Amino acid sequence: MLMIVQLLVFALGLAVAVPIQNYTQSPSQRDESSQWVSPHYYPTPQGGRLQDVWQEAYARAKAIVGQMTIVEKVNLTTGTGWQLDPCVGNTGSVPRFGIPNLCLQDGPLGVRFADFVTGYPSGLATGATFNKDLFLQRGQALGHEFNSKGVHIALGPAVGPLGVKARGGRNFEAFGSDPYLQGTAAAATIKGLQENNVMACVKHFIGNEQEKYRQPDDINPATNQTTKEAISANIPDRAMHALYLWPFADSVRAGVGSVMCSYNRVNNTYACENSYMMNHLLKEELGFQGFVVSDWGAQLSGVYSAISGLDMSMPGEVYGGWNTGTSFWGQNLTKAIYNETVPIERLDDMATRILAALYATNSFPTEDHLPNFSSWTTKEYGNKYYADNTTEIVKVNYNVDPSNDFTEDTALKVAEESIVLLKNENNTLPISPEKAKRLLLSGIAAGPDPIGYQCEDQSCTNGALFQGWGSGSVGSPKYQVTPFEEISYLARKNKMQFDYIRESYDLAQVTKVASDAHLSIVVVSAASGEGYITVDGNQGDRKNLTLWNNGDKLIETVAENCANTVVVVTSTGQINFEGFADHPNVTAIVWAGPLGDRSGTAIANILFGKANPSGHLPFTIAKTDDDYIPIETYSPSSGEPEDNHLVENDLLVDYRYFEEKNIEPRYAFGYGLSYNEYEVSNAKVSAAKKVDEELPEPATYLSEFSYQNAKDSKNPSDAFAPADLNRVNEYLYPYLDSNVTLKDGNYEYPDGYSTEQRTTPNQPGGGLGGNDALWEVAYNSTDKFVPQGNSTDKFVPQLYLKHPEDGKFETPIQLRGFEKVELSPGEKKTVDLRLLRRDLSVWDTTRQSWIVESGTYEALIGVAVNDIKTSVLFTI
């Protein structure tokens, strides 16, 4: 019988094919039409060819993949579909080798869609602690809870967005607006997760700096027209390496098992089919040995994404076609393998990378370590496959409580240490019950939301701010403590007269009560989230930087009537402080990012002195909103929006911009008051290793490998479904239909396409996170600190580096070290900060490598980028 296998080549959203002869050139060069382009780079580097700690994992993975059939390999690469299996993402299983459906679950703040879990302090709040120990402990606590709920792969941490746009919707998920801070926090988080046998998935790779236009089919507000393509984050070459790629390098060095590619385009090619980003930058230059998974629906092509370095498609269906049973991969990837449009070696590499990552991170699941919850229902029993109501009824929720003393203590510690004291006149804080016997608390953001907190992905914003909204939120935390609950408790405990006024619009009662109060606390907020939810006209990104729920007017009213007003700002990013920062009656201001479930406890503990403030700002707060990089809302008539603000600012992101332009901020990056001042002495910088200008050449790759059975099946009947398969509606299977046979594919490959593996990495590559020499200690900085106050406090010495003024590459000041230190009165402590070779390096766009320029460097030691206590010159 003659049967036809017709490869379905989906072209939806394919990148513009750019004919570039030298596909190793920088993607930041403009073509004649001034369009930013991302060159092609092939093939995908085969995993397992670095001489590193992944070798054992690859040996174990190869032993299994070498015995797998084509459909078994395909089943590992493709999600089974939305709302069918219990997690937000689920791969197919391979029962013959004891591999169950892999469970991938959001997110960076805790286990999404699961009961009894903890909503942890956001990444932004965590970054504000500047505490490396807490970075790790939070990761360990997250790992414990994910593991306890049966999750195999946690979709976090987030280091994209980098936070270059103050109004960016998802800034709260990541750790702040500096790549060094982000990378340090991400690496520790990854280690903590993976120590608990849960694979981390660092995201979003790369340039996902705003929610507006992040996907096709968005609305241009100026024309009301639908966009054709997602926004292109146009990123220059130096900025790509020095800023956006930097924390991903830290993540790879930490052994992260998976990387999630983002929805947006990067230099006019979609991130999940961008061969330069995935094949060259991530897998070759950074030496990433794990697998790349698409953001949910971010895969916009079949063959093209496969040869460009994508390894796993989630949730499996095509963009815009969830619960339709239609996939770019699954059955279509099987077809592409049989007609050789996608090389079998690429499929082998996908499957091997996935299994090797499971082994390397100790997250390889057993058949009895499965999800004990359903993402889709809170009921104890439900359909085995939720979206197919014809399937059997089984127990889907086991009500497992994953928390313990360690997880709860960690959540509170991180929340407390993240709170930043911005102003404290007349020693207003900590609150003295003897001096402030009548206490007023006001603001919607102090109390519970009238509709509770289990609203759609935490988009309820008429109460205390615990999280931002979207897939990065925790939908069903075990409990949440508002500032009202804990402040009222401490007020009663201290026998204070206490009142709480929730009303933030009709301010007559606030005016009356504030005039009688000895001290007034005003809790205000500003929220943001993911772009698929719009709250009060905020489509993920914030429309402006004002406070929500009339917060600015509330502060003004209270301060005009109470001479001792404390303002507590809780927000997902920067807000405008100019209306009240200098008000004489606003005697204290604290800022907190989304603090998670223990938010109220942490805030109250800081205000009443049960814990001392030790947080530092993870971003710059400007005096004027025009000093921030704006959200791009313009879309041309072509319907292909581009973000050139990233080009215009280049390396000058956040504090780099303010320092370079000599702009005085309201509050600088790294700023945070404590109850002590600190004296710095004996500052030294000493060489640990001779540093040459150029990196050493990396070791050659290990030999390329192939599986003996890679070409053993050319009979499509081998890929037919088993006769006894009981199909689930809209479930994605890898099997070919039984009425097909093989036909040669007719795919037009991009210019420069090749399947020939390289024998040697490029110069900046060759190791996890890049050339191993980049990670060697080059210099040590030592400084002695002595507290000048009477309390035991924690503070954060910060090291900023200035490059030689006569260097070839103009390089702005940048954070290159920090350490959180606790000192008692009179105690002296020496703090050692290490400078790695990469910390001294600049990206040479001509050589396409990192170099260390000769000349005089300056190490500046301070407690904020604009509050330097001492500096040391050293010459290379």
From Swiss-Prot:
Can you tell me which residues are glycosylated? N22, N75, N224, N267, N332, N339, N372, N389, N426, N544, N585, N739, N780, N790
Which residues does the entry assign to the active site, renumbered to this chain?
D295
Q: Quick check: keyword Glycoprotein in the entry?
A: yes
Which superkingdom heads the taxonomic lineage of this protein's source? Answer: Eukaryota
Give the signal peptide, or none.
1-17
Keywords associated with the record: Carbohydrate metabolism, Cellulose degradation, Glycoprotein, Glycosidase, Hydrolase, Polysaccharide degradation, Signal
Its EC number is 3.2.1.21
Would the keyword Plastid turn up in this protein's UniProt record? no
> Which catalysed reactions does the entry list for this protein?
Hydrolysis of terminal, non-reducing beta-D-glucosyl residues with release of beta-D-glucose
Q: Which Pfam families does the entry mention?
A: Fn3-like (PF14310), Glyco_hydro_3 (PF00933), Glyco_hydro_3_C (PF01915)
Q: What class of enzyme is it?
A: hydrolase
Give an example GO biological process.
Answer: cellulose catabolic process
Q: What pathway or pathways are given for this protein in its record?
A: Glycan metabolism; cellulose degradation
In the record, the note on similarity to other proteins reads: Belongs to the glycosyl hydrolase 3 family.
Q: What is this protein called?
A: Beta-glucosidase 1
